[in-house]
């Protein structure tokens, strides 16, 4: 465990969350990032930061929670993957002032920064403007706003679901 020279990991966290704000409120990027946890282990040599114990990461309208949140950096010191594990882990973001908060749940939530991709694994659920998507695994492309839901092949799941369950609300007609 090392606590020396932790600024690259902290700046990396800022970059990771800041880039996920592309679909969040415009003011979110300018907000400070706050990490609350019972403990933190920062290893600059390996490029890994692990936060444990009721972890809450917030920036503006974006919130990520879990029992454990891990950040991994690439060789250049940029955050590559943010992983939250919980019972369940939780992610929320307000995409626009006139939109409802998008909520996402999963026993594991992975955010692949450079790929603009959020992966929810095991008991995965997304709630967006009254629509719900549930399944073993949900992959959300934050840049293209595409949701893929299905089986979590190659992953052990606690509650196998052979099928996805989606509820899509009818569009409201303009009056």
From Swiss-Prot:
**Knocked-out gene: effects:** Essential, it cannot be deleted. LptH depletion affects cell envelope stability, and almost completely abrogates the ability to cause infection in a G.mellonella model of infection and in a mouse model of pulmonary infection.
Any Gene Ontology CC annotation: outer membrane-bounded periplasmic space
Signal sequence extent: 1-24
| Example GO molecular function | glycolipid transfer activity
- Cell location: Periplasm
Work out whether the entry's keyword set contains Metal-binding. Answer: no
| Gene name of the record | lptH
Q: What does this protein do?
A: Involved in the assembly of lipopolysaccharide (LPS). Required for the translocation of LPS from the inner membrane to the outer membrane. May form a bridge between the inner membrane and the outer membrane, via interactions with LptC and LptD, thereby facilitating LPS transfer across the periplasm. Binds LPS. Important for cell envelope stability and essential for growth, cell viability and ability to cause infection in different animal models.
Give the comment on domains: Adopts the canonical beta-jellyroll structure present in E.coli Lpt proteins.
Q: Where are the transmembrane segments?
A: none
Record-given protein name:
Lipopolysaccharide export system protein LptH
**InterPro entries to which the protein is assigned, alphabetical:** LPS_export_LptA, LptA, OstA-like_N
- Per UniProt, which keywords does this protein have? Periplasm, Signal, Transport
The GO annotation for biological process reads: Gram-negative-bacterium-type cell outer membrane assembly; lipopolysaccharide transport
> Beyond the main fields, what else does the record say?
Can complement E.coli lptA-depleted mutants. Can functionally replace E.coli-LptA in the Lpt complex to ensure cell viability, although outer membrane biogenesis and functionality appear to be partially impaired. Was identified as a promising drug target.
What family is reported? Belongs to the LptA family.
Q: Which domain of life is it from?
A: Bacteria
Q: How does it assemble?
A: Component of the lipopolysaccharide transport and assembly complex. Mainly exists as a dimer in solution. Tends to oligomerize already in solution. The protomers follow one another in a head-to-tail fashion throughout the crystal lattice, yielding a continuous fiber arrangement.
């Amino acid at each position: 465990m090392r606590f020396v020279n932790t600024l690259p990991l902290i700046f990396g966290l800022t970059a990771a969350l800041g880039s996920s704000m592309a679909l969040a409120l415009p003011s979110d990027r300018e907000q400070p990032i706050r990490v609350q946890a019972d403990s933190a282990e920062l290893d600059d040599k390996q490029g890994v930061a692990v936060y444990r114990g009721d972890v809450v990461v917030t920036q503006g309208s974006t919130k990520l929670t879990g029992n454990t949140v891990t950040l991994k950096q690439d060789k250049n010191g940029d955050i590559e993957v943010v992983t939250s594990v919980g019972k369940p882990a939780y992610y929320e973001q307000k995409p626009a002032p006139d939109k409802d908060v998008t909520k996402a749940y999963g026993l594991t939530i992975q955010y692949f920064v450079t790929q603009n991709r959020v992966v929810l694994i095991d008991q995965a659920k997304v709630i967006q403007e009254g629509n719900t998507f549930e399944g073993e695994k949900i992959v959300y492309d934050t840049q293209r706003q595409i949701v893929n839901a299905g089986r979590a092949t190659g992953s052990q799941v606690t509650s196998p679901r052979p099928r996805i369950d989606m509820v899509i609300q009818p569009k409201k007609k303009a009056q």
